[in-house]
Amino acid sequence: MGAGEKMAKVENWIDEKNGFSRPIAGRLLTHCFVAMFLGFIGGFVWLIALADNVFHILPLPRMEIQVPDQKELIRNAHTGTITNAMYVMAMVALSPWLRFSQRQAKWVYYGAITMLWGNIIGYSTAVFTPYRGIQPIFENDIANLFSYFTFYAAVIGAIITTGICLNNAIRAARTN
């Protein structure tokens, strides 16, 4: 049974408090912790770039490792990935107060995953293109193509998840 078939069988997207059910929250948090791990790897690459392509932690020998000369973009691959993971973790933690419907929980779940992985791929591939993945210039630049469209998908995911969470937060603020 594949992951899609397992997800199709999950009928309880929310728990009795209308937050994410434990299995759904666990799956979202798994994506978040994988993203955090990848963000930490980006941090090591950023440190190597800041140290002029030298990796030297005692007692290991000094090693020269070539990384792209895009320190700002490498930093973004580190901080952006971790920030997005924390944002999705906050959605999971706050879900009981946001009181999702079944439909909203599904939209937030898939939107959050799209946002998270779109940004991970976008930040990572933007390092290898002069256009940073923010301009639709695709001539002989597959990295920019990848980065641009994954950022585009991430924006759609962010709008969906943030919109639903904002709507439900406003609704919660208005209730007694």
Features from the language model and the residues they span:
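Interfacial loop-to-transmembrane junctions
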Residues: 137-150
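Juxtamembrane membrane-water interface segments of multi-pass membrane proteins
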Residues: 8-27, 46-71, 88-110, 128-137, ...
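N-terminal amphipathic/basic-hydrophobic helices that include classical n-h-c signal peptides
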Residues: 1-8
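Hydrophobic cores of alpha-helical transmembrane segments in multi-pass integral membrane proteins
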Residues: 28-51, 72-95, 110-127, 151-166
